[in-house]
Amino acid sequence: MERGAVLFALNHMVAPKLRLAEFLALASSLGISRVEIRNDLSGNVLLDGTPAADVAITVKQAGVEVVSINALQRFNDWSLAREREAIELADYAAESGAKALVLVPRNDGQGCGESERHANLTSALKALAPILASRGLAGLVEPLGFEICSLRLKSEAVKAIDAVQGADVFKLVHDTFHHHLAGEAALFPDRTGLVHISGVDDPTVAVSDMRDSHRVLIDASDRLDNLGQIKALRAAGYTGPLSFEPFADNVHKLDAAQVRDSLAASMALVAAGVTA
């Protein structure tokens, strides 16, 4: 069962060494029925060539729902190659039973000019909309707070989505780490389809120097105000899942039992903190 009114999900990045069936078992052992699978885990689904139909069977047997496949990278750097990649990934997502495809922007310091940001974003969304809609998928646009990213602000994503009349297809990912880095005050709970949660507990790293490698499970030392962000989203009407997405090596080195215990502790802290 879910913990109270808080819906949790697990991104496969929480335990990238676990095979799909093991990962789904981890989720089920925690009472979590929603997961995200990824296309960037070496030796694992999807890079190991597992057919989408096999994923669908494994997921159904586990009794869980795949809320997203994460991710189409550099989606706003549109090209014929990106279109082919998007179609292939969307086909896989639909055939595996996933509900959505996460869309990650270019993050290399290119395409960051104000005018080109909007133009690149709208052209990509316009091209992606029929690809996703025809397969019954949502597109989850995930701004990244890094200073070199071509899409840092959710407000820019919403503006572009509205410009292409894409609100029926596209939602936002509110990532608590990237929201903190971007320094954006505005929340868009009614436009948000998924929330990624992770913490930073290193007291020495400056916000501008925070990277994925600093992202751990949320604990009492969290510097990102995860509880404040989540409470604000919930108070404004967000009722969707909170998906754990830590990238730090000290999380990835945990064995299945250790990561389960750590997740259980983090879930309890978050649930208590946001429902108090």
Give the residues covered by each predicted segment:
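Histidine-acidic metal/acid-base catalytic patches
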Residues: M1-A9, K17, A21-S33, A56, ...
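Active-site beta-loop-alpha junctions enriched in small/polar residues
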Residues: N11-A15, R38-S42, A71-R74, R106-D108, ...
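Active-site acidic/histidine proton-transfer and metal-coordination neighborhood
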Residues: A21-A25, Q61, E65, D77-L172, ...
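Short, well-structured secondary-structure segments
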Residues: S33-N39, E65-I69, L101-L103
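Glycine-rich, proline-tolerant flexible connector loops at the mouths of alpha/beta enzymes
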Residues: E36-K60, N107-G113
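Hydrophobic alpha-helical membrane-association signature
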Residues: P51, E85, L121-A124, S262, ...
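Short, basic/glycine-rich phosphate-binding loops at helix/coil junctions
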Residues: E65-N70, A138, S208-D209
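The substrate-binding groove and active-site-proximal loops of carbohydrate-active enzymes
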Residues: L72-L80, V216-A220
